Amino acid sequence: MSAQMALSLSGVHKSFGTTSVLKNVEFSLTKGECIAIVGKSGCGKSTLLRLLARLEQPTAGEVYIPNGDIVRMMFQEGRLLPWKTVLQNVMLGLKHDRKRKALEAIKSVQLEGKENEWPRALSGGQKQRVALARTLVHSPHVLLLDEPLGALDALTRREMQQLIEKIWLQRGFSVVLVTHDIDEAVTLADRVYVIENGSIANTYDINLPRPRKRSSYEFVETAEEILNRVLGVNATNGHLVSLSNIK
């Protein structure tokens, strides 16, 4: 494997009993790259992320992540422990220099002054910032994002997208983002994979300058093309078609 490879999947299948969830999934991620995975509900996106997080094992095929590389995952809900403060939540799992590392992570997500707050006193956006800090404190090589902004309002989502992009570009780790928000995928990702019925249906390279302008023609055109692909819409006549017939 290349020294620049952050992870790769080769011929990955995943079944639960007689139900096949992922079928012959193959892709790779280079160090410092951000990819997004989009598709309809139930297409296998979150199962794929669980394989990358080593929470599940593939039924067949190989998931490769270099030995020693740290992988962390952020979910749609912050999953903060309500009986612990912000600082204590971020320190969870650390063995050495816990307070200093946690304070640095809290600062990086712009929550200075909230260290001693309880989760119940935080807004939804602040809780997700704590959840992000809790992943960053471990200095991950790969960050997995499972619909991390799905429960937030539009303005807070935009702020969090900008924060994630800023930290990712500064630190140079790799990112795998699962999202239903096509605009979010085009805003953050270098490459977007569309999954249909457990298989990769199409791949889009996003060659737009950063920071990306959502109002630009190129952004709107790219997002619309991907959305039509997910929905199975023929952009020429607006009719629904089978995704399997589109190449």
From Swiss-Prot:
It is found in: Cell membrane. Transmembrane segments: none annotated. ATP binds at residues 39-46. It comes from the Bacteria. PROSITE patterns: ABC_TRANSPORTER_1, ABC_TRANSPORTER_2, SSUB. The keyword Transport applies. Coiled coil: none annotated. GO terms for cellular component: plasma membrane. It catalyses: ATP + H2O + aliphatic sulfonate-[sulfonate-binding protein]Side 1 = ADP + phosphate + aliphatic sulfonateSide 2 + [sulfonate-binding protein]Side 1. Pfam families: ABC_tran (PF00005). Its main location: membrane. One of its GO terms (molecular function) is ATP hydrolysis activity. The keyword tRNA-binding does not apply. Gene3D superfamilies: P-loop containing nucleotide triphosphate hydrolases (3.40.50.300). Signal peptide: none annotated. CDD domains: ABC_NrtD_SsuB_transporters. Residues 7-222 form the ABC transporter domain. Belongs to the ABC transporter superfamily. Aliphatic sulfonates importer (TC 3.A.1.17.2) family. Part of the ABC transporter complex SsuABC involved in aliphatic sulfonates import. Responsible for energy coupling to the transport system. The complex is composed of two ATP-binding proteins (SsuB), two transmembrane proteins (SsuC) and a solute-binding protein (SsuA). This is Aliphatic sulfonates import ATP-binding protein SsuB 1. The lineage of its organism: Bacteria, Bacillati, Bacillota, Bacilli, Bacillales.
